[in-house]
């Protein structure tokens, strides 16, 4: 049973471990799902940011194309203006040459700006190609990560399904165990009811059998004494039966009588001594009359009665000592030493208590500094070196105590951690206690069931045996009645004693011969009824013991076979659960490794995205700066072109005026 209980406890521990691992795996699955959701959210954010960047790139490319077209138009206008200026240069005078030189300077600046714009445009195209390549790489990498995340999600779903299956099976096992427990409780109740009924019947039969046995034994003791038919001289050697209960009862009665007699003797002695003292003192104190002869005789009788009472007490004490056995007592030296030790301990406690009260009452006076004041002013005397050293030590101790403590965990965080720890430990301990209590209850109920089943079987066997024994006793009593009548008639007629005895012997030898041959293999049989009863009771007790041992053996063998089958089933289940747990642990380790790799890759992808965002922001800023510079330059070029047009128009007007003047001349 102890091995089974240990194995059941091991199975319960493994079940609790599996439940704890299942909870951990559930938490891991939830964490993985939350991490996958967060990764999906981050991916959506990154896609939105990429779309924004692409839109900005498209807008910038469109703006750049517009600027290129504007520059081309300006270049064409510049070429036209240059051609016109060349034509007018051939016709114009020296002031037009100065303007042409200025125009050539502006043209050179414009040509440099155009070259710089082309170079920047080429760099922008290269950067755009690099950005597209990196975007393609990141998109492929993102697709790969999405596929891996889907695989990881599938693995997590598979693990969750398996754990749900295991949980379902464990819940079914728990339900079956509860059903078994309820059935066992019902069977235990039924067995209790049956055993109570059997016990009541057994008590009733025992009372009936005991009453009949008492009656038959009294009849046998009174009517059928031990009588040796062969040698009558042996009848004088009969020894009375030994009764231990009677001796114990006699000892108790003697002890009680001794106590009562001691009390009575002491009371009588006190009464007699005080009465004698009063009788003798009263006349002498009053000095009225002398002691009468009656009082003197009464005091003499009291003295004699006291001597008799003391002798009676001593004799009864010797009787009690002869009956009882004295236990070894402690020596006088040990008792005196113990009393001295107790007295010294009491004196020590009292003296220490007095010292404590003394110091507590005079603490203020002892701590105050002693001084003297000869002329009104308090003068403090010099203190001893030992007092100064003790003060220094006290100051050092106070300084060491007042040192700042090291930083610790904040109080709120510590309370939260303690609450979490206590809740987790309480839940775990509560579950463990529930499991242990249920196991103990199951084992206790099984033991009670087995016990009551065995008791019921034994009670049935006892009932059968007692019924058979009652029948045998009734038959024997019926047989013994005519024998007692024959003995009585033989006692009345002394002449026919030998003939009656011979007839009784023949009848007694003939009647018990058949059951003796059937039950006992012994060749010699007792002719008396007492011998037959004793032999039958011994055979019945041995048969009862054999049947009881056989029943117990068969019951325990069947129970051991059942428990071995249950143990084999539990071992197979435990092996299966252990294999599943190992597989789940391996998959969990693989999932954790894949999660770590995915986390690292996600970190790298985030780093690349942040780097690209930084590069994009820098390129965007540079392009914005360049566009602002180009816009400023175009504004300045427009202003110069407008000024040049104005100068060209003025030159044209002046040229026309000069031509008209020349024509008029």
Swiss-Prot record:
This protein's record includes keyword Lyase: no
Residues forming coiled coils: 1-84, 125-206, 426-477, 586-627
Keyword field: Coiled coil, Endosome, RNA-binding
One GO term describing the cellular component: early endosome
Compartment(s) where it occurs, according to its Swiss-Prot or TrEMBL record: Early endosome
One function term, GO molecular function aspect: RNA binding
Keyword RNA-binding: yes
Residues in the signal sequence: none
Main location: other
Superkingdom assignment: Eukaryota
Entry's free-text remark on domains: Coiled-coil domains of PPP1R21 are essential for RNA binding.
Function text: Component of the FERRY complex (Five-subunit Endosomal Rab5 and RNA/ribosome intermediary). The FERRY complex directly interacts with mRNAs and RAB5A, and functions as a RAB5A effector involved in the localization and the distribution of specific mRNAs most likely by mediating their endosomal transport. The complex recruits mRNAs and ribosomes to early endosomes through direct mRNA-interaction. Putative regulator of protein phosphatase 1 (PP1) activity. May play a role in the endosomal sorting process or in endosome maturation pathway.
Subunit architecture: Component of the FERRY complex.
Identification of the protein by name: Protein phosphatase 1 regulatory subunit 21
Top-level taxonomy: Eukaryota, Metazoa, Chordata, Craniata, Vertebrata
């Amino acid at each position: 049973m102890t091995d089974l209980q240990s194995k059941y406890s091991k199975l319960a521990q493994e079940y609790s471990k599996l439940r704890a691992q299942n909870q951990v795996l559930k938490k891991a699955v939830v964490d993985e799902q939350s991490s996958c959701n967060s990764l999906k959210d981050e991916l959506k954010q990154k896609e939105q940011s990429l779309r924004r960047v692409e839109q900005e790139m498209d807008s910038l490319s469109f703006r750049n194309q517009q600027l290129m077209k504007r520059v081309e138009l300006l270049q064409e206008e510049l070429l036209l203006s240059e051609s016109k200026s060349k034509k007018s240069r051939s016709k114009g005078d020296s002031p037009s040459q100065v303007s042409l030189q200025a125009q050539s300077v502006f043209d050179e600046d414009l040509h440099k700006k155009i070259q710089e714009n082309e170079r920047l445009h080429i760099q922008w195209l290269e950067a755009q190609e690099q950005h597209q390549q990196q975007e393609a790489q990141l998109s492929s990498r993102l697709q790969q990560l999405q596929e891996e995340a889907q695989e990881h999600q599938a693995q997590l779903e598979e693990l969750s399904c398996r754990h749900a299956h295991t949980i379902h099976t464990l819940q079914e096992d728990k339900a079956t165990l509860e059903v078994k427990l309820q059935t066992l409780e019902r069977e235990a109740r039924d067995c209790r009811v049956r055993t109570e009924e059997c016990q009541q019947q057994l008590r009733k039969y025992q009372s009936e059998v005991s009453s009949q046995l008492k009656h038959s034994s009294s009849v046998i003791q009174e009517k059928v004494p031990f009588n040796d038919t062969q040698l009558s001289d042996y009848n004088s050697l009969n020894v009375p039966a030994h009764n231990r209960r009677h001796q114990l009862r006699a000892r108790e009665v003697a002890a009680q009588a001794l106590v009562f007699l001691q009390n009575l003797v002491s009371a009588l002695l006190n009464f007699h001594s005080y009465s004698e003292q009063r009788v003798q003192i009263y006349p002498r104190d009053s000095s009225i009359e002398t002691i009468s002869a009656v009082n003197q005789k009464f005091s003499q009788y009291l003295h004699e009665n006291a001597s008799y009472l003391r002798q009676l007490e001593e004799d009864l004490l010797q009787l009690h000592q002869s009956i009882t056995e004295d236990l070894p007592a402690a020596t006088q030296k040990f008792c005196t030493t113990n009393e001295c030790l107790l007295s010294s301990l009491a004196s020590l406690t009292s003296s220490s208590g007095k010292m404590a009260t003394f110091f507590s009452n005079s603490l203020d006076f002892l701590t105050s500094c002693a001084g003297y004041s000869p002329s009104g002013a308090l003068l403090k005397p010099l203190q001893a070196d030992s007092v100064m050293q003790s003060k220094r030590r006290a100051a050092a101790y106070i300084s060491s105590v007042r040192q700042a403590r090291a930083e610790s965990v904040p109080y709120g965080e510590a309370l939260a951690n303690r609450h979490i720890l206590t809740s987790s430990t309480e839940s775990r301990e509560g579950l463990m206690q529930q499991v242990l209590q249920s196991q103990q209850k199951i084992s206790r109920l099984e033991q009670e069931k087995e016990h009551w089943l065995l008791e019921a079987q034994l009670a049935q066997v006892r009932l059968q045996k007692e019924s058979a024994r009652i029948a045998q006793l009734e038959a024997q009593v019926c047989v013994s009645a005519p024998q007692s009548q024959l003995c009585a008639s033989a006692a009345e007629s002394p002449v026919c004693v030998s003939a009656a005895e011979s007839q009784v012997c023949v009848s007694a030898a003939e009647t018990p011969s058949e059951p003796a041959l059937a039950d006992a293999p012994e060749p010699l049989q007792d002719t008396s009824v007492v011998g037959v009863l004793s032999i039958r009771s011994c055979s019945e007790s041995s048969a009862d013991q054999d049947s009881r041992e056989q029943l117990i053996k068969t019951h325990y063998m069947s129970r051991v076979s059942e428990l071995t089958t249950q143990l084999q089933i539990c071992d197979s289940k435990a092996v299966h659960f252990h294999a599943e747990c190992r597989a789940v642990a391996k998959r969990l380790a693989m999932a954790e490794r894949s999660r770590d790799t995915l986390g690292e890759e996600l970190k790298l992808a985030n780093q690349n995205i942040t780097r690209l965002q930084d590069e994009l922001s820098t390129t965007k800023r540079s392009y914005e700066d360049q566009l602002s510079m180009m816009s400023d330059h175009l504004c300045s070029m427009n202003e110069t072109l407008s000024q040049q047009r104005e100068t060209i128009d003025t030159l044209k007007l002046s040229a026309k005026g000069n031509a008209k003047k020349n024509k008029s001349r």
